[in-house]
Amino acid sequence: MVMGLSVVFVCIVCCLFTGLFMMLSEKRGLDREKCSPYECGFEPIGSARSPFSIRFFLVAVLFVVFDVEVVLLMPFAYMFFYGKSVLGILSSSGFLLILFVGLYHEYREGSLEWVG
């Protein structure tokens, strides 16, 4: 009980000090140097803000999401090899169903079409 209260007390004190320091700190405006892009110490040549394809960004995000989900499927393969429990099979089937529903939604939305 004492340990739990001490952790809560330390968190409250940290939050109070953080708020106090934020209120008392000096506010500085952004100058031109802070807003300019940094290019290895050299003066920037041209604009660093090049146009970026939103379609490519969406495909990259989808790749990362589905790649992480494939990594989350690895324990299910281990479970199928060493232990065959009904709960494990149902949970992995539910996870795969959610994966395929998400993939179907992205397909129907048109996010997987590169040209369109």
Swiss-Prot record:
Q: What class of enzyme is it?
A: translocase
One Pfam family hit: Oxidored_q4
**What stretches pass through the bilayer?**
1-21, 56-76, 85-105
Q: How does it sit in the membrane?
A: Multi-pass membrane protein
Catalytic reactions of this protein: a ubiquinone + NADH + 5 H(+)(in) = a ubiquinol + NAD(+) + 4 H(+)(out)
- Compartments in which it is found: Mitochondrion membrane
List, alphabetically, the GO terms of the cellular component aspect: mitochondrial membrane; NADH dehydrogenase complex
Question: Which terms are listed as keywords in the entry?
Answer: Electron transport, Membrane, Mitochondrion, NAD, Respiratory chain, Translocase, Transmembrane, Transmembrane helix, Transport, Ubiquinone
EC number(s): the record gives: 7.1.1.2
Q: Does Transmembrane appear among the keywords?
A: yes
* GO molecular-function term, one example from the UniProt record: NADH dehydrogenase (ubiquinone) activity
Family statement drawn from the similarity comment of this UniProt entry: Belongs to the complex I subunit 3 family.
Q: What does this protein do?
A: Core subunit of the mitochondrial membrane respiratory chain NADH dehydrogenase (Complex I) that is believed to belong to the minimal assembly required for catalysis. Complex I functions in the transfer of electrons from NADH to the respiratory chain. The immediate electron acceptor for the enzyme is believed to be ubiquinone.
Q: What is this protein called?
A: NADH-ubiquinone oxidoreductase chain 3
List the source organism.
Mytilus edulis
Per UniProt, what is the name of the gene that codes for the protein in this document?
ND3
